[in-house]
């Protein structure tokens, strides 16, 4: 079974800087220029839809920085920003862990390592058993882009391939866990899982119990097109709490969601969208 690496960074600008959109581009630039974790460049450039890498937006005061309009975000010199990179690779990246002052096209930054976590995917099963009697709360830390077309029967997905239905701003349990399933399958090397993801999502919708939610849509800037126009998308933030009474199904959902708590869910995880946090709520706490 593969390993998941999660590295937390402190990122301090040494001058006033205008952050790029999305702000994850700062660390992405350092990887692609070979200055930080150069072995991850192949993962970044991969066209694989569910590739096992997540680069967070920069964070300030425990909130991720992302653009919701045309206004660029200016950060003052000396501000303590944070970032997380999570990935799975066969390469030994530990010798590549580095700190120091780095020049980027966005400014000069002092970068230090805050934390390093290495998780054996096989051992996620042990974590699953700890929470079988809990409700599951999925909290969206950054705007999350979930296409409901994931729940189309595979026989119809090709027919509606060109229909732009946007992203769900009120995602169902089935949609969330279907995306997590796809991330997990890619992580362990299982291919051609569209039919299974569809079935798993539909069954999870039918057999889940929603306890509560606080979800809201957010329009975010995800970059620029070839003409310099802003590319926008509508995603979701907030949280949803649910339970799955069927034990076998819940065990699977927990395993997939635990992997996604490192690698994110939805579109554009490689640039910071779809960051989630799992919270577990004792059933007796709910009235």
Swiss-Prot record:
Pfam families attached to this UniProt entry: Cas6_N, CRISPR_Cas6
Nuclease found in the keyword field: yes
Biological processes per GO annotation: defense response to virus
Nuclease listed as a keyword: yes
Enzyme Commission number, as recorded: 3.1.-.-
GO molecular function, one term: endonuclease activity
InterPro entries attached to this UniProt entry: Cas6_N_arch, CRISPR-assoc_Cas6_C, CRISPR-assoc_prot_Cas6
Record keywords: Antiviral defense, Endonuclease, Hydrolase, Nuclease
Family named by the database record: Belongs to the CRISPR-associated endoribonuclease Cas6 family.
Role, per record: CRISPR (clustered regularly interspaced short palindromic repeat) is an adaptive immune system that provides protection against mobile genetic elements (viruses, transposable elements and conjugative plasmids). CRISPR clusters contain spacers, sequences complementary to antecedent mobile elements, and target invading nucleic acids. CRISPR clusters are transcribed and processed into CRISPR RNA (crRNA).
Record's subunit section: Part of the aCascade ribonucleoprotein complex, minimally composed of Csa2 and Cas5a, which binds crRNA. Other possible components of aCascade in strain P1 are Cas6b (SSO1437) and Csa5 (SSO1443), while SSO1399, Cas5b (SSO1400) and SSO1401 have sometimes been seen weakly associated. Csa2 is probably the major RNA-binding subunit. The Csa2-Cas5a-crRNA complex also binds target DNA homologous to crRNA, probably forming an R-loop. Purified aCascade forms a filament about 6 nm in width.
More info: The aCascade complex was purified from strain P1.
Protein name, entry field: CRISPR-associated endoribonuclease Cas6 1
Gene label: cas6a
